[in-house]
Amino acid sequence: MSDSVLSNPTRQHATLREILARRDWENPACTNYQRLPAHPPFNSWRNVAAAHQDEPSQRLRRLNGEWKFSYFTRPEAVPESWLQQDLPDSATIPVPSNWQLQGYDTPIYTNVKYPIPVNPPYVPEDNPTGCYSLTFKVNHDWLSCGQTRVIFDGVNSAFYLWCNGHWVGYSQDSRLPAEFDISRYLTTGENRLAVMVLRWSDGSYLEDQDMWRMSGIFRDVTLLHKPTVHLGDIQLTTPLSADFRHGTLDIQVKATLSESEAKNYRVHAQLWRGNNLIGETRQAFGSDIVDERGTYHDRASLRLDVTRPDLWSAELPHLYRAVIALETAEGELLEAEAYDVGFRKVEISNGLLLLNGKPLLIRGVNRHEHHPQNGQVMDEETMRRDIMLMKQHNFNAVRCSHYPNHPLWYRLCDRYGLYVVDEANIETHGMQPMNRLSDDPMWLPAYSERVSRMVQRDRNHPCIIIWSLGNESGYGANHDALYQWIKRHDPTRPVHYEGGGANSRATDIVCPMYARVDEDQPFPNVPKWSISKWISMPNEHRPLILCEYAHAMGNSLGGFARYWKAFRQYPRLQGGFIWDWVDQALIRHDEQGNAYWAYGGDFGDMPNDRQFCLDGLLFPDRTPHPSLYEAQRAQQHIQFVWQAESPCELRVTSEYLFRHTDNEQLNWHITLDDKTLVEGSLPLKLAPQATQTLTLLESLPTVDRAGEIWLNVEVVQPKETAWSKANHRCAWDQWQLPIPLHLPEASCSKQKIPPVLRASDIYFDVVQGEQHWRFNRQSGLLEQWWTADTPALLTPLQDQFVRAPLDNDIGISEVDRIDPHAWAERWKSAGLYQLQTQCVAIQADQLADAVHIVTEHVFRHAGQILLRSKKRWQIDAYGVMTVDVDVDVATVLPSLARVGLSCQLADVAPQVSWIGLGPHENYPDRQLAAQHGHWNLPLDDLHTPYIFPSENGLRCNTRALTYGKWAITGNFHFGLSRYGLTQLMTCTHHHLLEKEKGVWLNLDGFHMGIGGDDSWSPSVHCDDLLTATHYHYRVAIQRH
């Protein structure tokens, strides 16, 4: 390697070997060569009207499409000739894309553990390398004057760039743009860009996020042409008066011009509201005096005052349009830039995070950029769909976890209305200790650029209300330095950072992850107090917003309603961000070509964290998990209180801070089981934060039969919005009405046929008309039930105390070690999956109009009786079999998963009908969104297709169930599934499940909660555990 390359890193004709010998990708002080300074996105319009109307700029040219591509196992394997021409065996690859999804290399999913040996700043010698090239032409007018830039919006993880064989530069940080001036290398006719992308770099140690590790040019590549004298940076702020009636648009402009040229140019600024010009101003270059050395010659400050501006919020995302034009002193336009502007003020005052003077309640979610087919390549349709789904399900905020997003994301959040936490691309979770790099000054340049460049790119977006220094990187001096940098360069927004215990000096907000409502987690040095306790700690006056909570992995989000009760109770608990938005599964195909969802390890990737990437509220195709409805219901902006029966009064409160309910209609109806007794609707007109009492009826309706009476209310939006269709339901609630019933005598038109008991040495047989029951005297089980000689059971009806473990039951045992505290491990250790059943008593009696049978079973493990179940069976003259079950539980057992009955039915009927909670899956600690009603669904719709199979599909608090010929009444939870317990426990992927004969029926008198505060430690609230020593329940079953 020649000394000239070391002393002059910008030497353009250095050989490939000389450049690679520098090993820039293993030098944390070297984050780039020749990369241009960060700035907001530029379009360089040459027409002010086009800038105002946001028309496509003629000076912006996408280079997305098919590029030439060659793959190598290490950068040193790339031949020198590639700099000048494509290799004979080069293929094509789409740009943007991740090369691991195009047939090269392997995607790796890991959460904490680094996918490479930890030896910062060094990375493996075998470092997969992708060599891209594109041949393109440039217009003559671009070559004759001005500057041509190439912009890479996202390349993972580091890359070198050549143009026509000349070395242009180097860059790393996969989530922010890298922009280079290539003007001097371009020629008339064809030009060639060559990009060498390295999978691993020292930057990889700062990108240890919980996600798939993939590589390549995965965001847009663009050519931008600017005039010789051009705009270099623009910063917009919108200070408001104390009463929010007057606003100012402050514009700070920096241009690329010399001191002698400055007098020849000026800046022209316009502010538009739609097609109405609100104001305009012009200003020559030259700043105010800064210090004893003078002024900035290349800067200009402009100001436009606005009276009674329409303020921006997520509820009412009012936007203006600012056009900033660079002109000659005579008024000739050189170029123009334009940005959406939202007038709003973010501040922390008296311990509260305020927007426009109102305390926010963050209804937030963490979102990775993930597409099941395209990996980390995001398209506009997917981004819009995510935003619309968030808005439809009452989210008002999103955290860009854990890196700056595609630039379009912020524009869409501005326009649709979402509060954004913009997060720097820094995570060192796998370091030991975690702050190893964060407290090392050698890594300060890399940290600094990742934070400062994010702020410089994104600061003009009104949707961004909080800056984040990164995620799970411990806490060190680098964080303190960057916190201070942001506070100086953008004092209009608070800074958030969770590391170091969530309440360090580098955060304006106490922002823990997975702190619980009422349980302390006193980890050494970084305790997680219960959230209500945290805000009452001495000298703690900051607001608390959970940066992550409610880990939505698989069948989860149990106990979610408790968080929202606390948020509404304590003003300084200002909400949080659910983890997370979408399951990060990728589409893969089996040997037969069938597509399936793949997770960690499915590509042969090592190391991997298996299905820990499946923790979203949505499936990868954006189909909702049932837990999404729980979030929607808990976060709804309209709250209801049932006040009185006569007259029937309802108190309705709006939690909107800025929005009048001008597109809301309240619908209500009162039902008796499956019958609507009375209903009505009325427009809902509420001012922000207002309460109104509505009289629905003067008196409640009378009823003439037994049943449960419910008042159901919902709020719909009759007109479509930018993010929802007409009649979108945005809020709902219901109450069981305590009405005394005066019922007539019960009567039954069905003919009474007393059952007959027949006893043999092996069986007790009971016959009633066409019905025939058989109890095995040895096993004590209901072995078969015939109707007109057709058998109804494939397996006996028997006790069930376990479930196919949820991710929350398995905990960290599913990753890399066994956790004896996990519920699944406790159940295994207790022997609940290997119980030996013995019938210790069975007795049958013939009564006048019924047969009465008593059975008693004990359940042993390792010789010890753990459970005892006594059942009283009564078969009456109408063919109804009633089962009273009493279960005694040994005190040595952990909480049971369920106490119930299970069997395999022979019938496979298409529809299921029930009266109880529905229509979607619900569990004892996740049923806020479910409603009591009469529901009908196809059998297959009762199953939730979690990618990693587990217990699913329960419906709680059921009063009546009808399935085929079966009719069951009582007070129970039920599940009907084509997949049995054994298969759900042993199968690793949903697509491998095979429908079994018949249908499995679970009837639970009791079911343990599912938890969801997190997925790696037991999180089911004590109220939702089954820790009693005795349980009793009853069901009545008949066949028609």
From Swiss-Prot:
- Residues that bind Mg(2+) 2: 608
Q: Which GO terms describe its molecular function?
A: beta-galactosidase activity; carbohydrate binding; magnesium ion binding
Write down the Pfam families for this protein, in alphabetical order.
Bgal_small_N, Glyco_hydro_2, Glyco_hydro_2_C, Glyco_hydro_2_N, LacZ_4
Q: What name does this protein carry? A: Beta-galactosidase
Ranges that cross the membrane: none
Question: Which catalysed reactions does the entry list for this protein?
Answer: Hydrolysis of terminal non-reducing beta-D-galactose residues in beta-D-galactosides
Name the Enzyme Commission number(s) assigned to this protein. Answer: 3.2.1.23
* Cofactor annotation: Mg(2+); Na(+)
Which residues act catalytically here? 472 (proton donor), 548 (nucleophile)
Q: Which HAMAP family match?
A: Beta_gal
